[in-house]
């Protein structure tokens, strides 16, 4: 059928009929969904598209295993799914990721694209559903309520693999920086006030340790994602799914995805509850909370360059101002802060969406997976950019840090065991009021000798457990 300059085909469902552009692979249900949900302007995440193709391929293979699906139809479905996994036809997934219907629109988008491509493979025209139907054949033994959660599990696990690799690389650079800066002494601060000396390497080692815990937490959070509810069909009872099909489809899912997937031991539970996603999201939130704190530290230590702390230098990535010539901003650290705000907000959305489930199904999974996959993706992209464009190039301004240590009254803490708290406090106060150093005041008041102060006020020794100048107390 021609309509103006375009050629169309007509498809029907129980609500009526619609004209579909003849060359597209999606069908009437996808078109209805795209008209109903023009929400975000975003596309379905490519890992979610691939995960849906994996599910459809596994289901076709399992249905052929149990002789429910004719071999010719099944192999055409498998080939169409493989083409999607090769990167083809992704532009045919047009429904908005945020949608009503618990993911039915996304599932039908996959069914129709795979179905119409399979029809072509079999030598038929798109939309000629008498030979192969998106619902009857591509969706055989399935419901959106097991297809969609299973695809969420697979896509999330795939993205987490990439994120964890990026985090391991970032952790390695933090460890390298900790070693590089191990001999660099700086002033430690609590309440943003001078405390006692610390090594810059110790601070970076602390960053590497918290990141190490985050990696471990995220790895552990994947545990329940390996359990899928494929075979649950509508409410977890497995209606219309052959028991042997259920066994085979999980086996094929594991083989195709390369993931150690297993069938959930209670399909009703696995169909109605979404705590596996909130567990992952919580670990991402904690990670970004920690990374944002690190970014705050880096921004503060790099403040200046003339009128701030200027203890470290961050790589200059771009001009920082449209009005102030020469200004450079800590844009990569600021990036981490903003990713943290987004991930923390996404986690709140995921919690609310998980709580909103009712009875046998959580219909809010579309907004849940949209935010979960976004969190993982922006963390992966952000960490990679931060590592390459900032972390690797951080330099220590040793001269500046040495000056701060020498000028600070905080080193009086090392003198405390030798003079007593009250006497040490008087010297500290005088140092703050007069601007003189603790060393000069101790000599001025004749409370310690030059040689004793060399031992007690050795800044490197102050960064290790013990009492500075302990041997002097034992005389």
Curated annotation (Swiss-Prot):
One of its GO terms (molecular function) is aspartate ammonia-lyase activity. It catalyses: L-aspartate = fumarate + NH4(+). Residues 320-329 are annotated as: SS loop. It comes from the Bacteria. Gene3D superfamilies: Fumarase/aspartase (C-terminal domain), Fumarase/aspartase (Central domain), Fumarase/aspartase (N-terminal domain). One of its GO terms (cellular component) is cytosol. The active site is at residue 321. Keywords: Lyase. InterPro entries: ApsA (IPR004708), Aspartate_Ammonia-Lyase (IPR051546), Fumarase/histidase_N (IPR024083), Fumarase_C_C (IPR018951), Fumarate_lyase_CS (IPR020557), Fumarate_lyase_fam (IPR000362), Fumarate_lyase_N (IPR022761), L-Aspartase-like (IPR008948). Its EC number is 4.3.1.1. Induction: Part of the ans operon, which contains ansA, encoding L-asparaginase, and ansB. Contains two transcription start sites, depending on the growth medium. L-aspartate binds at residues 104, 143-145, 190-191, 322, 327. It is an enzyme of class 4 (lyase). One of its GO terms (biological process) is tricarboxylic acid cycle. PANTHER family: ASPARTATE AMMONIA-LYASE. Belongs to the class-II fumarase/aspartase family. Aspartase subfamily. NCBIfam families: aspA, PRK12273.1, PRK14515.1. Catalyzes the reversible conversion of L-aspartate to fumarate and ammonia. This is Aspartate ammonia-lyase.
